[in-house]
């Protein structure tokens, strides 16, 4: 068995250089411009991921840094709604009591605890009422529940 003694930093250098170049070359965008480039509001979907109590306001993993995003995200999504966007999805951490993820992060956002619900400031907005609601018991909403 061969052991790779190369440090993580050394193995990651090429990717980090790429990422640095990518972020430095990003161009500003407007919501209207993005909607237009999608062929109109029918070609746009807006997705909220994990802006739930357990990460924003209460619980072991809540952080004021994430909580400060609630208002600006809500305002952006309201602007999308005003521009005619009607496809919204809300992806929420909502773990079973024995979620494997708890081994790494400790219990958080347990289904039914209140920590798993969309922040109230967002939940009462028009776009949130009919949004596709996706609860997830995994880091990714696209991975098998587990």
Positions of predicted regions on the chain:
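Active-site acidic carboxylates
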Residues: 2-134
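Glycine-rich phosphate- or other oxyanion-binding loops that anchor nucleotides, phosphorylated ligands
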Residues: 133-146
């Amino acid at each position: 068995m061969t052991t790779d003694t190369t440090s993580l930093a050394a193995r990651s250098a090429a990717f980090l250089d790429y990422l640095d170049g990518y972020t430095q070359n990003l161009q500003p965008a407007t919501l209207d411009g993005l909607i237009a480039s999608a062929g109109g509001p029918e070609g746009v979907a807006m997705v909220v991921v994990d802006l739930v109590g357990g990460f924003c306001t209460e619980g072991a993993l809540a952080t004021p840094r994430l909580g400060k995003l609630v208002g600006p995200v809500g305002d952006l999504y309201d602007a999308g709604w005003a521009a005619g966007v009607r496809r919204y999805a809300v992806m929420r951490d909502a773990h079973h009591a024995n979620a494997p993820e708890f081994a790494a992060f400790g219990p958080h956002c347990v289904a039914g605890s209140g920590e798993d619900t969309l922040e109230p400031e967002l939940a009462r907005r028009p776009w949130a009422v009919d949004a596709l609601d996706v609860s997830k018991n995994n880091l990714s909403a696209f991975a098998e529940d587990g």
